[in-house]
């Protein structure tokens, strides 16, 4: 599972997730991708479950890129604890994802296989997603 090796602060503020993602909106490494249509926190367990679903369907063919990383800790207090007496203990790690961000990329498989693998992965995630393809730059080649 994805977790940071070292962090400066164990407990973080929750923060706001307004607007669209600043970067990572296009498919860059692979040929096909899975793009988030709304903003949400995605846990390291959800990322791992989606990765396993994709690789199982592709049967060890192709390559998968995970474009998000869970660098933000979230905390929780024990059940039955009264208000006050400080912030809770770190519970897990999340990747804050804004709408428009490409979450996963795939290459080395056909479009049908990629579409189905990413559909299976999307069922493991708490965000609405859509299948996207890499946009080719320029229509004609300038060679020779």
UniProtKB/Swiss-Prot annotation:
InterPro entries: Ribosomal_uL16, Ribosomal_uL16_bact-type, Ribosomal_uL16_CS, Ribosomal_uL16_dom, Ribosomal_uL16_sf. This is Large ribosomal subunit protein uL16. Part of the 50S ribosomal subunit. Keywords: Ribonucleoprotein, Ribosomal protein, RNA-binding, rRNA-binding, tRNA-binding. One of its GO terms (cellular component) is cytosolic large ribosomal subunit. It comes from Ligilactobacillus salivarius (strain UCC118). HAMAP family: Ribosomal_uL16. PANTHER family: 50S/60S RIBOSOMAL PROTEIN L16, LARGE RIBOSOMAL SUBUNIT PROTEIN UL16M. Belongs to the universal ribosomal protein uL16 family. Pfam families: Ribosomal_L16. One of its GO terms (molecular function) is structural constituent of ribosome. The keyword tRNA-binding applies. GO terms for biological process: translation. Gene3D superfamilies: Ribosomal protein L10e/L16 (3.90.1170.10). Binds 23S rRNA and is also seen to make contacts with the A and possibly P site tRNAs.
């Amino acid at each position: 599972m994805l977790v940071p090796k070292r962090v400066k602060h164990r407990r973080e503020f929750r923060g706001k997730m307004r607007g669209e993602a600043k970067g990572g909106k296009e498919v860059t490494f692979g040929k096909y991708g899975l793009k988030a249509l709304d903003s949400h926190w995605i846990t390291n367990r959800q990322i791992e479950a989606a990765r396993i679903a994709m690789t199982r369907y592709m049967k060890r063919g192709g390559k998968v890129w995970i474009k998000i990383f869970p660098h933000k800790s979230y905390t929780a207090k024990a059940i039955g604890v009264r208000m006050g007496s400080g912030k809770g203990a770190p519970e897990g790690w999340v990747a804050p994802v804004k709408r428009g961000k490409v979450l996963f990329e795939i290459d080395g498989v056909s479009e049908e296989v990629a579409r189905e693998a990413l559909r299976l992965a999307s069922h493991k995630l708490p965000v609405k997603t859509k299948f996207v393809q890499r946009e080719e730059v320029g229509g004609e080649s300038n060679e020779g």
